[in-house]
Amino acid sequence: MNPLNTQWFYWAFHKQLRAELGRQKADVVWREAGQEYTRILTTAPAMKRHNGAMALPAVALYRTLTSRGENAEALLNAYGDRMGRRFAGIVHGITSIPGVSRLIWRHVAGIMDRMSGENLGYRRRIVSEPPDLYGVDILSCPYHELAKALGNEKAVLCICHMDKAYMKGFRHIRYERTTAVSEGAECCDYRLRFDRNRK
């Protein structure tokens, strides 16, 4: 069985590849990327438990697509955008339930702390000014660091694209990022503000 089939975030990428490259070519790419993913983990089994392990399928797909002359970065980033829009719809549905956005805002400092904690492999700088602004500068991210160590840091941009797209789904919360470490910036500058007019 192709190990990529067990990676929930990447399941739909196979379907997108079929639409972009044709069924036969996409199936070959998917199979070879699965083999590359297995090779990466065989070479360094500890990577499976790395905080940035979600980037490994992207690295395998990036390498395979590039070796076949495809624009791996564009294909993966388009997929990240698509998944981000899908997640944004889910987030919007949840935060449209009366009281949910205020509940999230009440606990936003703790949520932010857990989602970008150093125990998850992040280096960060808190820049919050409560109660109006909660923010964190991510100075290094485990996904980017792992992809960079494997020599394919651009592979992780699809996760950044997903992230930026899904952030638009919050109702009553403006969740923004204008820079990203993976794009060469000093940090990923996450900023959250409560906005009751945001629909």
Regions found by a protein language model. Give the residues of each.
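Short flexible/disordered coil segments
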Residues: 2-3, 9-10, 54-68, 145, ...
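N-terminal, charged low-complexity regulatory/assembly segments
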Residues: 1-63
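Amphipathic interaction/junction segments at domain boundaries or subunit interfaces
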Residues: 53, 57-59, 63-150
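Residue-level preference for well-ordered alpha-helical positions
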Residues: 18, 66, 167-168
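Charge-dense, low-complexity intrinsically disordered segments
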Residues: 4, 48, 99-102, 150, ...
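Generic structural motif
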Residues: 28, 122-125, 175
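C-terminal non-catalytic interaction appendages of large macromolecular assemblies
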Residues: 132-135, 142-199
